[in-house]
Amino acid sequence: MSNAFQISRNLWELKMGMVNAYLLETMDGLVLIDAGWPNKTDTIFSAVQDSGLDPKDIRHLVLTHGHIDHAGSAAEVLQRTGARSYAHTADLDLINEGKAEDPGTSVTLGIIPKIVYLLFIKPGGTTYKAFAVDQTLSLERSYRFDQ
């Protein structure tokens, strides 16, 4: 069963369980959008291979935000591919410290989120491996990865 679903000619959804990542094929190589939970790099790379592409061609990693379910495997993806990383300025503190969430975040939405919280978030905070962001992103400009 493939863990890559082709959305358009050059865009794939990479299925990783509770969260997904996306893969964009550009003239400059592959752009991975998000890196899932910690220890999911092999799952990501397997899904990239399911798309018919090579994980070694990942040149850019764009994080939608710095929470553990989107940035957890980022450090390992970057280390194994040599890709450049991109994140919004507002997430730099989380990413630089490898923190799962802003310390002020609390779960109050019912039993299912509480169960997820208890299973995946350690009391006092869950961490992932911190890494350096190569370039910050702003929603006020556009970006091209094919130059």
Q: What kind of region is each of these model predictions?
A:
Residues G17-V19, S46-D50, A71-G72, P123, ...:
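A generic local structural motif
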Residues M27-G29, A83, E140:
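Short loop segments at secondary-structure junctions
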